[in-house]
Amino acid sequence: MEGAFAANWSAEAVNGSAAPPGTEGNRTAGPPQRNEALARVEVAVLSLILFLALSGNACVLLALRTTRHKHSRLFFFMKHLSIADLAVAVFQVLPQLLWDITFRFYGPDLLCRLVKYLQVVGMFASTYLLLLMSLDRCLAICQPLRSLRRRTDRLAVLATWLGCLVASAPQVHIFSLREVADGVFDCWAVFIQPWGPKAYITWITLAVYIVPVIVLAACYGLISFKIWQNLRLKTEAAAAEASAGAEGAAADCAGRAALARVSNVKLISKAKIRTVKMTFIVVLAFIVCWTPFFFKQMWSVWDADAPKEASAFIIAMLLASLNSCCNPWIYMLFTGHLFQDLVQRFLCCSFRRLKGSQLGETSVTKKIHSYTFVLSRHSSSQRSCSQPSTV
């Protein structure tokens, strides 16, 4: 993860390489070294994160496929966000895991550029699909009539994926297979000095973290205001209903209007607030996981005296990787019926197969018994015919 777009000194701090940051052609005199104990811990944690991300998001996609409410708007965005998290696991966590095992990149230049490109594609997609889902929840609360256009959702998701593919294109130019020491090659970034690293890391931080967080904060600010407004409306409607009941039949129309307003507010507070809570927790997990990583990157490029300890980069990278496997557990917490349906479907299929195999065995056993019975009767009749009759 730290190698997805990080400058060379980030990789230098983690891997222990002494290659100068952003320079081409300068090499170290001795072979590169690294902290093997720290590398083993990183490999173990990344392996666990990869397993949880693959299994969790695969279960979410399978549950969304088998549910009866698969055409729900929220489930549509959850499906694409799970696909993006799978992309992060396969194209970002897995290459980083293999890279930590081998220490150096072993592959052609084309593979180096492709891996670096796909690493950032998954990161962009996960961020902006989360942003898209939050905007959808904001529209569902603030403007429910406009949120009913499903075709617009599909176009927005398609545009998001295409935009992520385009925004990740600079990775192909920046990273390449280069000689970082005498006879040692690695997938390395080369920037124009001295402003290149600052410009690129700042742009990535703005595009993937700061701007999305600002938009997400605005969305949930509007959602909070709308919820507060509806709660206030509910209180006023309840008071109007009570006053209408006290005044009698003369205020019957006002009482009915109050009841309608109350039922409308209850609908918002029960049917939509739960989904808003879920997306808010997903956003909060995104902020918690990615803040140390981007803070460390920005500190490294803008402060020449910033510490470059390997442990700090490792912790920030592992925390960022954790975001790809925590979303399925959040989905499970707020939409538990999805996984209950999946478990029930699995148990039903297993029971049917078991019952079918038992029925097959029973039918075969019955056929064997009937065939044995026929043979025994036939043999007994033959014995009775062969015996002489006695008077």
From Swiss-Prot:
The keyword Membrane applies. Gene3D superfamilies: Rhodopsin 7-helix transmembrane proteins. Disulfide bonds join C112-C187. It is a multi-pass membrane protein. It comes from the Eukaryota. The chain crosses the membrane at residues 39-63, 75-97, 114-135, 155-175, 203-225, 278-296, 312-334. Residues 64-74, 136-154, 226-277, 335-391 are cytoplasmic. GO terms for biological process: cellular response to hormone stimulus; female pregnancy; maternal process involved in parturition; positive regulation of vasoconstriction; regulation of systemic arterial blood pressure by vasopressin. GO terms for molecular function: oxytocin receptor activity; peptide binding; vasopressin receptor activity. Belongs to the G-protein coupled receptor 1 family. Vasopressin/oxytocin receptor subfamily. This is Oxytocin receptor.
